[in-house]
Amino acid sequence: MTTVNSNIRDNCKREKAARFLSENLCPDAVLSVASAYFTVQAYDQLREKLDAIASMRFLFGDPDYVNKIDPEKTASKRFAIVNNGLDLKDALRQKAAVKGCAEWIRAKVEIKSVINRALLHGKLYHIAPPGRDSRAMFGSSNFTTRGLGLADSQNNIELNMEITDQRDRDDLL
């Protein structure tokens, strides 16, 4: 698929949201994220870059969102696992990814939650590299494999914009 040169990241013709992170994350950077969802699989695919950052500040949607997705707890767990892109061949690798992610969170991540009746909808990725201007992207991509365009197939079609004005990037924090 050919890509279009643009500051839009849509996981289709205008690059993947993950590319913004991969190209801009660097050792000792501070990453600030606002997202309603976070998956270990997304961390695992960006692990090399994320392990090298100084810290991450994560503004998370209501932590009770899991219960809101299936309040009657009727959804098939098998379906949920398959729908999230997991299968048996990944089970052993997933255990190591979960352990690595937990260690990374304990060492580098500060998590704050939005406790409100309304859901956190806006997403933000702000990178402050040492000694350089910050970088930022905001839009619709959650910190998930499909949201960031990291899935092998069926990535979400998103609408994110890389912010090119330094004043606007500073205002986002």
Language-model region placement:
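PLD/PLD-like phosphodiesterase catalytic module centered on the HKD motif
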Residues: 1-173
